[in-house]
């Protein structure tokens, strides 16, 4: 059996990006660990009690069969033009020493004997500064710890842009969100793993519902979350029943359906292109 560590920026990210994959791994008998960099105090556009958000994370993780939850100790950096001062006794993640943060994560990877680290793509999905930092710290920690194999949690850029068009029409996002989505995530051709998690849709939806601060708060994201957690499970599974990853330095003829299966190296110069 394998040990898989999922490194995320904030509480609720573990559901949105890897919830079904974590539930599937746990059901198959593997050990799963969730590590969050930040406490969630600036999550989803609302000020929130960090301890409440971390408690919600633990409840979510339990619904996904996660064996252990760890907070690295950093505060949220927020998403937007303003970077707030550090709160008392904490450092905002984007201001953290990357080497120190990577050292903390590497120590945990060694302690767990991790076989795989789930991290983030280089764009930080839609450009969130904490998500970009997760990518940098995750890559460095994996190298320090072994190295440990890495998969970057992401989504096909083309699919994200397509889905956000009707969501924007419903008033749930604004223009700059759509622009960020079109420039973020990962091009479809670079996706190496596509995981079918439709059998775990009920668990994933229940885990999202555990994040009550995010679901019942204010703002566009909360309205969207409330809509999603109330969907019939088959419809939720249709929308959120696949999760995507990119393996750095690898390329596949078609996406692999198991995160524990490694992709082959990308073709070098003069070796042709991969047909998808």
Name the predicted role of every residue range.
Residues 2-3, 85, 91, 95-276:
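Metal-dependent de-N-acetylase/amidase catalytic core
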Residues 1-113, 140, 246-255, 273-276:
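Active-site rim/loop-helix segments in enzyme catalytic domains that contact anionic ligands
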């Amino acid at each position: 059996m394998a040990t898989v560590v999922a490194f995320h920026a904030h509480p609720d990210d573990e559901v949105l990006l890897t919830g079904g994959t974590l539930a599937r791994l746990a059901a198959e008998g593997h050990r799963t660990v969730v590590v969050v960099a930040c406490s969630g105090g600036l999550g989803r556009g609302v000020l929130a009690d960090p301890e409440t958000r971390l408690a919600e994370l633990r409840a979510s993780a339990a619904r996904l069969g996660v064996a252990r939850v760890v907070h690295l100790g950093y505060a949220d950096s927020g998403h937007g033009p303003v970077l707030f001062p550090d709160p008392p006794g904490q450092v905002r993640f984007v201001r953290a020493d990357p080497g120190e943060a990577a050292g903390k994560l590497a120590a945990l990877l060694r302690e767990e004997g991790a076989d795989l680290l789930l991290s983030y793509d280089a764009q930080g999905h839609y450009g969130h500064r904490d998500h970009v930092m997760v990518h940098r710290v995750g890559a460095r920690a994996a190298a320090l710890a072994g190295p440990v194999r890495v998969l970057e949690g992401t989504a096909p850029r083309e699919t994200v842009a397509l889905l956000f068009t009707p969501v924007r029409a419903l008033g749930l996002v604004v223009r700059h969100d759509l622009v960020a989505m079109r420039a973020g995530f990962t091009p479809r051709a670079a996706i190496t793993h596509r995981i079918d998690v439709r059998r775990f849709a009920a668990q994933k939806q229940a885990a999202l519902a555990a994040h009550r601060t995010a679901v019942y708060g204010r703002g566009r994201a909360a309205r969207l979350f409330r809509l999603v957690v109330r969907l019939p499970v088959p419809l939720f599974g249709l929308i959120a029943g696949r999760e995507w990853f990119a393996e750095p330095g690898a390329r596949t003829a078609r996406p692999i359906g198991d995160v524990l299966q490694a992709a082959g190296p990308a073709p070098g110069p003069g070796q042709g292109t991969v047909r998808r």
